[in-house]
A protein has these predicted regions:
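Short, hydrophobic/aromatic-rich segments at coil-to-beta transitions
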Residues: 44-51, 70-77, 166-174, 205-209
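N-terminal leader/targeting segments and the immediate start of mature chains
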Residues: 1-66, 231-242
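A mature extracytoplasmic/lumenal domain signature
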Residues: 54-56, 80-82, 95, 104, ...
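Solvent-exposed helix/loop surface patches that form functional interfaces
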Residues: 113-168, 239-241
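An acidic-aromatic
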Residues: 70-140
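Gly/Pro-enriched, hydrophobic low-complexity segments
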Residues: 168-241
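Solvent-exposed loop/turn segments connecting transmembrane beta-strands
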Residues: 56-61, 82-88, 215-216
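Extended lipid/amphipathic-ligand handling interfaces
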Residues: 36-39, 63-71, 91, 197, ...
Length: 242
């Protein structure tokens, strides 16, 4: 059955801390090519280690874990601040479902093998949840083929600055509105005035993504860590996409 489409309006705004505020300009051919392959490189790698900082008026959440871009599944530890500490525990998600495993003493990293029991499952919400929107966005940051480099500048992609992320020199680029499907589609070239911001290395490696979600005034920040990626094992009852 075809997956129902869901659109998240992602808006990159504000200033980039630690970055060079260079004048906005159209992407060069090399820059467009790097932006075009960045999602494909995530898929080609199999997966990436990620840290997702989710905004919330109650305090916010941080998810630390891994995303398997070929299987379409993420897994990690979720920790909250302020009133959001009640969300602490393990989390696993696909494009269709979110599973949480509450823990009073949450480990720094998720165990390689998910617990056999104690999971609470719910559908991934299409709107109204900054966490669920963030999880869906992360899954969409991998693609089994490059994007069209020629269309990116035509649709408004631009270079907005330079920065350093954990010692890596990066270019900060914007892309138009990003459309995430109920699968793993995430198209930087979608035609819209809204933008998402990417921190891209000289070889096309994606180091950071920042995007707004409709339910919060602050953006979600997705950092692709230098930690080693470990393949994600599905929790009981979870069927990976791959």
């Amino acid at each position: 059955m075809a997956a129902a489409a869901t659109t998240f309006f992602l808006i990159g705004g504000g200033t980039d801390s630690g970055g060079d505020s260079a004048a906005r300009r159209t992407l060069t051919s090399d820059e467009a090519n790097r932006l075009a392959i960045t999602r494909f490189l995530n898929y080609q790698a199999g997966g990436r280690a990620v840290t997702i900082t989710v905004p919330s008026a109650a305090g916010g959440l941080v998810v630390t874990g891994s995303v398997d871009y070929r299987a379409g599944i993420g897994y990690g530890v979720v920790r909250g601040a302020g009133r959001d500490t009640s969300s602490d525990g393990l989390i696993q998600w696909t494009a269709a479902a979110v599973l949480v495993h509450p823990m009073t003493d949450t480990p720094a990293t998720a165990p390689p093998a998910p617990p056999a029991s104690g999971w609470y499952r719910r559908p991934l919400q299409k709107s109204g949840s900054a966490l669920d929107s963030s999880l869906a966005i992360v899954l969409g940051l991998g693609s089994d083929r490059p994007d069209n480099a020629e269309l990116l500048p035509q649709n408004g992609a631009a270079l907005v600055g330079k920065d350093r992320v954990r010692g890596h020199s990066v270019d900060v680029m914007t892309g138009p509105n990003v459309r995430a499907n109920d699968g793993t589609s995430f198209a930087p070239g979608s035609n819209s005035s809204s933008t998402v911001r990417y921190w891209i290395g000289g070889d096309g490696t994606m180091y950071r993504v920042r995007a707004g979600v409709a339910s919060e005034s602050q953006p979600v920040v997705i950092d692709f860590d230098d930690r080693k990626y470990f393949p994600v094992r599905a929790a009981p009852g979870v069927t990976p996409a791959g």
